Structures are given as C-alpha cells and as structure tokens.
Amino acid sequence: MDSKRLIIFVLLSVGILFGWNEYFMPKHTPQQQAAKTQATTGAANNVAQPADANKLTRGQRIQVKTDLVEAEIDTVGGDLRSLKLLKHGAAEDHKQPFQLFEDSAKRVYVAQTGLVAASNPALPTHKTVFTSDKPSYQLTGDTLEVKLTAPDANGVKVSKVYTFKKNSYEIGVRYDIVNGGAAPLAPTAYYRLLRDSQAPEGEGRMAHTYTGPAVYTSEHKFQKVSFDDLAKGKGDYAKTTTDGWVAMLQHYFMSAWILKPLDGASVCKDERSCRFELKETAGLNSAAALVDYATVAPGKSLSVSVPLYAGPEEYNIISKLADGMEYAKDFGIFYIFASPLFWLLVKLHGLVSNWGWAIVLLTLTVKAVFYPLTAASYRSMAKMKALAPRLERLKAQHGDDRMKFQQAVMEMYKTEKVNPLGGCLPMLIQIPVFIGLYWALLASVELRGAPWVLWYTDLARPDPYYILPVIMAATMFLQTFLNPPPADPMQAKMMKIMPLAFSALFFFFPAGLVLYYVVNNVLSMAQQWFINKQIEKSNKAALQS
C-alpha cells in the first residue's frame, strides 16, 4: 500500500474508531433511562429536582425578540423554554431559524433556575408561577430587560430579570431579593440546563461530535461527562469551584452558565460557595451550577446576576466570554493539532472573506510546510518504482519460494540503498496534523451556511450535485498510476478498488471537508509529478556523466 493510500486509510479508520461508540454502542432513550434510573434527591443541597421529561408544567409564554434570537419564557419557573437563533437556519429547512431550546412532546432542552433555603421553603423555584407586566417584548435599543415577579415568600420579595443585549447571544439572569421578613436569609441558587438524550437536529452519521454536559474550572480545566455515564451515575468532574462554567454541548451550538465572565468578577464568594452538579433524573440530563448567595439581613436587599450563553460555538464569540470556553469547540483528542490549524483558518478567512477560499489557502499552507517530508517520501517511492521490473524478475526467478524471494528483495534493497518504509514514514508523521485539520473543519460552525462559489451555499452540508466527491474519486484513482505498482496482483487490484470504496464515503461528508481533500490530492499529484520529473532529470544527468 503506497503512502497516500495509507494516509486516507488511517484517516478514515480513525474516524470510524472515533464514531464507533456513538454509532454502534447501545443508546439510551429518555424513556429507557427513566425506567431504569432512580432519581437522586439532592437533599444535601436542598435543591429542587428536575421535572419528568413528560411533565414539565406549562404556563403562559412571554415572547421576546432581539436582532439575534426569538425566546419564550414560561411563567412557570420563569424558565427559558424556547430559543431560536435567527441568523442560523434549521438543518432540514434553512428558511426556518435553528431552535436550540425547545419544550415539546418530542424534545426537551430548557434553561431553569430557582432559589432554595432551609429557613424559607416558599422561595421561588422552577415550579413557582411568576407574573409579568407584558406578554411580549421587542429589543429596540442596546438592552432589554424582562422582569418576572414571584409571589411573596414569607415577607421576602423576589424578582427574576432577564437582560437581552443587542448583537449578543449572552443573556443576563438576575435575582433581585428584598428581605422583608424577620429572619436572615441565606439562599442557594441553582442554574440548570436540562435536556433529553436525543441527538441534536441535523446530526449526521458522517459528522458526529460530542453531545452532552461539560464543566470548566481554572484548577481542573475542561471536563466532559457523557449521557451514558450520567445514566450510570458515573463521571469524574470538578464538584466545587470558585470560577468557570457549566455547559451543554452539541455539534455547532452550546449553552452555558458562566460563574466568572472573562471581564468580570466571579459570583462565587469563596471556594465552597459554588458547586457543579451533573446528573440524570427521570429521563432528563441536568448540568447545573449551585451558588450560595451572601446572607440577606432583614430589611436588606441583594442582587446577583449570572450570564447564560446560548448560541453558536463561534471562536471569536465564545473565546471572549470566559476562560477556557474555546474548548467547547469539539476538536476531539487531536485538539493540540486542530486548534492552531483552526486559528490559521480564521486568519486566512480574514484575508479573503470566504471560508471556501480560506480552506484552499490553508491546504496550500499545510502542503508547503510539509513539502520537504513529502519530497522525501516521493523520492523513496520513485526509487521503489524504478526497482519494480527487478522485483518482477525476482518473483519469476524464485517462484513459490517466498522465503528466498523475500531474502532476495531485502538484499536488493540493501544494495540499492533503498528503505522500503522510506515512502511511508514521512507521511506517517503528517497523519496527526491531517486528522487535526479534519476535526478543525468538522467542528467549525463558521462553515455552517457559509458559501463558496456556484452552488456551494453551505460548506457544512454535502455537495448537492456530488461534483467534489466525483473529483475526489478521480484524483485518488489517478494517483494509483503515479505510484509503484505492488508486486502482489491481489494488492494491485485492491489499489484500483480502494479509491472507489473510499470515495463513496465522501458523498456524505460536508462540502468543506471534501474541498480540503480534493485540493490536497490535486496538490499531492502536482508535487509528485514535479518531484518525479526532477528525479528523471537527475538520473539522465548521472547517466550522461
């Protein structure tokens, strides 16, 4: 197998390996999980438990519209039950906005908050019915506040205030507390993201990435816990923190409660006052931050605001929200390679203002950097190709005696100073980089809805006319003629079939990924032709001298 086929084979093999657990391991539907999971009580924190997936109480809906989102806030709990992203089209119908939060019979993904205190069980939770002055709100300036008022809680007055900002997916959630009671109040607030285990809208078999909760702290960094581990009561993550964020991640989009914004102070007053809690209860997965508020003396008031980010995983946005939030972009285990490649892709996009041409320039840059290794590989393959006739003669000479044939071949390699692995090793060094580039493109929401040329209006979707996959197949097939033929007839036949077999997978890949592979193959062929010509020229010069 020549080195180019080896690269493609390893790339696809690793891709299949990464997706194995997600595609072929048993999945738990919310109903199955509900049947087998015993709900934990959380009595230690006295935190209200999530409702059953089919029993989220519905009240009146408050409509909110900004330049970027359409939101629905339910008067029950003041929960954010629906959130549509107006600048991002739905996976199946791009004319409709993508819906991140949803509370319907088929899907549950909401943001909940509440207050609890042992001394005052009447504090508002996600089950309390709030009131609002208006049924709908429209952002007309730079900010918009939506105030919900809770019933009196033994003399304690509580308001829950949402703050929407222009040109922002960040939503402020503030509790205003006035203690009109006779006793001090020490409330704990919970900020929860609640969702079922279903794959997100538009999740494809060829573009499957992580879906589930994650936490980040300055001490323990980025940690993910799968839905399966939550259902089994497993998962290792930071339980206490003084900063960081807790999130629900999926392909291209995320939501997160931020305890310490990048440009602000932490809401945690000491190392024990903030806790993360990830669990599965009654068919729903919960990712929550618990925050102990400062004690509110009688006659005093307190206001605490925690930002909620709910939007795309765009690097230029999330990297400015909180420390470590750039890790939310799922580059897999090849983050160390994918992250700098994505950074370079963003810089190139800044030059050409087109993600398609940025991919072309990125491929050119990567090929230029690795040209010395590629040249060494092709020179080694050219030597192997020159020895092909002698290999055939050795095979005819030794017949079925494979032992003598192999000995003769190794002796020939030694005499001609040829390393049979010389064509593979330089390419093997590049494989992590190419896989990193694969993940950089796969995880980039920036490509979603991004046009290139002609009919390529969305580089995150497959080529609608399959032109790029066909070109991909053609380039792979043509490359077989530029490489030395394998001595084994069966292997030679496989080399003809493999391009067609692998190319079938590219029909389902996002167009941006296929564009990268097409450009990479064309450049590889051009490099190989150029290097072969150089070798032929040097060989002729050596003969003439």
From Swiss-Prot:
GO terms for biological process: protein insertion into membrane; protein transport. Belongs to the OXA1/ALB3/YidC family. Type 1 subfamily. Interacts with the Sec translocase complex via SecD. Specifically interacts with transmembrane segments of nascent integral membrane proteins during membrane integration. The gene is yidC. Keywords: Cell inner membrane, Cell membrane, Chaperone, Membrane, Protein transport, Transmembrane, Transmembrane helix, Transport. This is Membrane protein insertase YidC. It holds the Pfam family 60KD_IMP. It is found in: Cell inner membrane. GO terms for molecular function: membrane insertase activity.
